[in-house]
Amino acid sequence: MKCNRLENQVCVRTTGQYRLCCVSSEPDNVENIMTHDISKWTGSNARTNAIKLLTNNIWPDACTRCKVDEEAGIESTRQKSSHYGPGITHLDLRFGNACNLSCRMCWPGSSSSLVQEHQEFLMNDIISPWGESSFVVHNWYDDETALELASIPTLKEVYLTGGEPMMVKGLLKFIQLLDKNVSLRFNTNGTILNPTLLEEIKKFKNVNMCFSIDGVGKINDYIRWGSKWEDVYRNFKICKDAGFDVSIGPTVQILNELYMPELRQWASDEGVDIFENILSSPDYYSIKNAPWRNNNKRVHDDFIKYTNILDNKRNCFIADYLPEVANAYGIS
């Protein structure tokens, strides 16, 4: 068994920590891009041991996601990566957790805005949806590291997400260092589009902009709090007009499941692909626990509790944005 993604990609978390891949579930790795160059990671025990196990047809513990998918007959992340290689051809980078939005289903590890909100909850003795752990804002970008990454001779594709990649300090410098034959892929919330950066991105032959859009209009505004639909749609159109390969990647959850037909139709009308990501955590947002699907009182109570906490903090109320969902939970 072979995983080209594991062998031919370098994946870095928002903290700078190397990771086997974007869906792996290994414990914290000691190797961090701020203290270990790429060769230290590619030669690390965590990575080499995982490769050896797969070669012997043994699933590493960190690869449970792909194991479960393949046993269920679902194409796994491993199987989708056959075109990777030879050498390090792909980068999956999260330069930090800087983000201007406070998405309902997200967590402070991926959003600096949620770090602030979480801290405000704790300081005011209010129950936080993210527990009592402490979180910090990360930004591991520096010019030396950017040059090392951009100089990989076999590099074919760079995937940038976050946080919000358009907020990364130094992103323009990094983009300027890359060979223009490298494919660029962004996962963006669509609220920010720097004109200077846009002109630099236009120099690349292949650019994919995947907009994280969870609904049309005020549905998206509620779920991805801090966004304004008119801004997102304007930037969406700019990227389409620039000739980029534009798609949308909604996170399918209880908050938007009832409105997905509308979003699918919108994507079809706009002529873009839609890649639906099914949320698994937190469980009170998972569609398997929707009140129109089961009667799990504990999980439903959690949904109501955390919805009310965030609604009161943000002074926005679910009944005004997602009335069908509010009615299903008896929220008025």
Task: Give residue ranges: language-model regions.
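Short, basic/hydrophobic alpha-helical segments
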Residues: D143-A150, I175-Q176, F236-D241
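Residue-level recognition of alpha-helix termini/interfacial anchor residues
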Residues: T77, G170, L258-Y259
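Core AdoMet radical
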Residues: I88-A98, G109-Y141, P153-V168, K180-P195, ...
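N-terminal pre-core extensions flanking Radical SAM catalytic domains
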Residues: M1-V136, S151-I152, Y306-S332
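A short acidic, amphipathic alpha-helical/loop segment
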Residues: E148, G170-L177, T196-E200, Y222, ...
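A structural signal for well-ordered alpha-helical scaffolds and beta->alpha junctions
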Residues: T42-T48, P60, I88, D92, ...
